[in-house]
């Protein structure tokens, strides 16, 4: 029951047109979320991958995709740790370090997106250049 309720809540957020949903190279994350909570990503509204916007803001070639750590350092002057990225995310409960890692990854995306858009605007560029 708890898993179904969680899936329904996540699904409502994903379908909400008024809620900004940002990711960073997030295709795999969405696939894993769908596998864990079947149906929760069906009908997702406005999920934006911030990575291409960051790439454009940093003036990188279209084939170059910066990592989140590099993007945060370059656009926000913030150093984030990626140590937990390769830890065991299947094990439960998640460790305190994993929770902090996940929260940091999620909470940094809005300021990162704003910084990338601001840099593009100051250079009179669009995110798809």
State where each predicted segment sits:
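Acidic two-metal-ion nuclease catalytic site recognized across multiple nuclease folds
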Residues: 108-129
